[in-house]
């Protein structure tokens, strides 16, 4: 759904409405990324011992994110908003390359479709979050916080095991980060829209 009808002048969607959309979208992205990870895990990762290698290998690990709800509640909403933006921005490149490189994997039609959908929806969520930040802190240019990704060569390795592990790790991280964003947005909505009464 477009935020405003095309050609509408001075259209302003309420903050509550923007948060509703952002929370729905982030929930959708998280459920898609979980499905994609689970399908990939079942089809390609069985018996390869990927999980034991995948711990703490996410490119967004350099962004300090709260580990649980209690920690997240200690963070000022402005910092939490910027953190969500930073994590979303950090996924722009990897998602773009995931969409093109996943097509090299044999018999992965479902994964390809989900990757394309996630990449599109992630862009929408980032746009929505920029609108939210613009309303919460008008006129303030948020810092360009993000974590660069250098994993493209690993998605293009000739060795199939290494290449599949690189995909596995990326999908594992996407599921992890989309879950964090989903939780942070619910927390922010509760705090900024419902005055913590939820």
Swiss-Prot record:
Subcellular location: Secreted
Disulfide partners: 4-11, 58-173, 190-198
UniProt-listed InterPro entries: 4_helix_cytokine-like_core, Somatotropin/Prolactin, Somatotropin_CS
Keywords for this protein: Disulfide bond, Hormone, Secreted
GO biological process: positive regulation of cell population proliferation; positive regulation of receptor signaling pathway via JAK-STAT; response to nutrient levels
Tissue specificity comment: Pituitary gland.
Gene Ontology cellular component list: extracellular space
PANTHER family: PROLACTIN, SOMATOTROPIN,PROLACTIN
Similarity remark: Belongs to the somatotropin/prolactin family.
Record-given protein name: Prolactin
